[in-house]
């Protein structure tokens, strides 16, 4: 499957939908801005993949944020994906983490939060304790605990590529045991997918190999990319939240107010004239 593409599909005769995703440049662009240890690079690539897969299950316009926190060597793992199939991410750590276990890296008080923020509508957040070693297992536990639609996620990484497969049970039209049997069969078939197949074969061939006895409708593929939503306007909103007294105190001490985006490291610098305009004007411009 080509890199930096998301392929959605649906089983016409079943109440199940799915997604395939392969990322390369998207993750590389997020990693290149920071000096992450190898273990953190791996997990952040998985988180970006998971964020894009989850966001594609939603019909709304807005952002989906996945955030894992704890008190271990890995303090924060965060990925944010949009309905435009763009993503950004960040991680914070201490020491020299080298474990492949997410649970071990996060340590005590580990938790996973998923936040859905529609452009128009009410923000939703669900938080669950994090108790599994892999991110995919933690996400599946989240869906089980939050009593949402049955969802399975497989995440893959190999030779500088990341990706995944997501399955989701739709609200059953037939109901009962018949739908449960369909779901279990499709899950079992999906579990046979290998990283080599996902990263080297076209999406249509991957789906044919997995589900050649099923009726699968392949939807239009969608490009994915790294994109940071930081801007001068948003940064000025942060400056304004400091208050006039604090902002001008920084100006008196440093001659300017400088801020760097934590995701893309873009630098924003504002002199006295711009800050005076900010506090003298009722709106940002």
Curated annotation (Swiss-Prot):
It comes from the Bacteria. GO terms for molecular function: protein folding chaperone; unfolded protein binding. Under oxidizing conditions two disulfide bonds are formed involving the reactive cysteines. Under reducing conditions zinc is bound to the reactive cysteines and the protein is inactive. Keywords: Chaperone, Cytoplasm, Disulfide bond, Redox-active center, Zinc. The keyword tRNA-binding does not apply. It is found in: Cytoplasm. Disulfide bonds join 228-230, 261-264. One of its GO terms (cellular component) is cytoplasm. Belongs to the HSP33 family. This is 33 kDa chaperonin.
